[in-house]
Amino acid sequence: MSGALDVLQMKEEDVLKFLAAGTHLGGTNLDFQMEQYIYKRKSDGIYIINLKRTWEKLLLAARAIVAIENPADVSVISSRNTGQRAVLKFAAATGATPIAGRFTPGTFTNQIQAAFREPRLLVVTDPRADHQPLTEASYVNLPTIALCNTDSPLRYVDIAIPCNNKGAHSVGLMWWMLAREVLRMRGTISREHPWEVMPDLYFYRDPEEIEKEEQAAAEKAVTKEEFQGEWTAPAPEFTAAQPEVADWSEGVQVPSVPIQQFPTEDWSARPFTEDWSAAPTAQATEWVGTTSELS
């Protein structure tokens, strides 16, 4: 399919991207029309997709998209969440018309409604989830391209690109690859230099995961500021200006502090006024008497 041209052959970095994203991993079920794209079957029942056939169909789909004179006449659709961001990014890069989310029935057939469109080419992410636009495309003789898994029905699909259309990374990578090949065939970007757009921008991210990451980053920033504040706070006793002393042997003149004066009385000069050997006081006698009476 690549015409035996070296520039159109699949590079090693492309294969590594496919393997890292899990594009070659299909499902446990197999449609009879997808048997031609299967390489092997694993011991756990998962079918392995032949990436060589995936690359050939990717180039064929890119040629079909480039053949449309007006890029806006190409409609790209994804009703599933995993492909909506990729569809929007693909449309922004190639000029296609995106439909991300629910497809309104009658968009291609009902001329009365405001959302009526007449595209010349349709690209969908999942033939099973996007069955409505595929069915309407068959009514108006609209050629279709679809990312197909091992169990995807190929009814009303003209160009099937075998790949894993369930994983978020695989779907994002396939749309990124398709956008890159379209731009290369149009001459917008060169094949000699890598595309500056990263595949990560086409990946779907769960809003809950993004919120959790933002909260974790905010908490980490707060704890880091508190930690730095505790250790970087200036201590007043160490940062106070110290007096300059030319000769350290002289020392620093310490300001004199008034010392509280206490009476210097001679305790031995006091007259002896009490005899410790005298008899106990009357009060003690009374207590003794009281004790004797009680006894």
Curated annotation (Swiss-Prot):
GO biological process annotation, one example: ribosomal small subunit assembly
Site feature: Cleavage: A115, F116, P133, L134
Disulfide feature: none
SUPFAM superfamilies (alphabetical): Ribosomal protein S2
Compositional bias of kind Polar residues: 280-295
One Gene Ontology molecular-function label: laminin binding
PROSITE patterns hit by this protein: RIBOSOMAL_S2_1 (PS00962), RIBOSOMAL_S2_2 (PS00963)
Pfam families associated with the record: 40S_SA_C, Ribosomal_S2
Region (Interaction with PPP1R16B) residue spans: 54-113
Keywords: Acetylation, Cell membrane, Cytoplasm, Isopeptide bond, Membrane, Nucleus, Phosphoprotein, Receptor, Repeat, Ribonucleoprotein, Ribosomal protein, Ubl conjugation
Protein localization: Cell membrane; Cytoplasm; Nucleus
Modified residues (N6-acetyllysine): K52, K89
Transmembrane helix recorded as keyword: no
Region described as Laminin-binding: spans on this chain: 161-180, 205-229, 242-295
Record-listed Phosphothreonine modification sites: T97
Annotated segments matching region Disordered: 214-240, 263-295
Repeat positions for [DE]-W-[ST]: 230-232, 247-249, 266-268, 275-277
Gene Ontology cellular component list: cytoplasm; cytosolic small ribosomal subunit; nucleus; plasma membrane
Other comments on record: This protein appears to have acquired a second function as a laminin receptor specifically in the vertebrate lineage.
Family: Belongs to the universal ribosomal protein uS2 family.
Subunit structure: Monomer (37LRP) and homodimer (67LR). Component of the small ribosomal subunit. Mature ribosomes consist of a small (40S) and a large (60S) subunit. The 40S subunit contains about 33 different proteins and 1 molecule of RNA (18S). The 60S subunit contains about 49 different proteins and 3 molecules of RNA (28S, 5.8S and 5S). Interacts with RPS21. Interacts with several laminins including at least LAMB1. Interacts with MDK. The mature dimeric form interacts with PPP1R16B (via its fourth ankyrin repeat). Interacts with PPP1CA only in the presence of PPP1R16B.
PANTHER family per the UniProt record, alphabetical: 40S RIBOSOMAL PROTEIN SA
Protein name: Small ribosomal subunit protein uS2
Organism of provenance: Ovis aries
Classification lineage: Eukaryota, Metazoa, Chordata, Craniata, Vertebrata
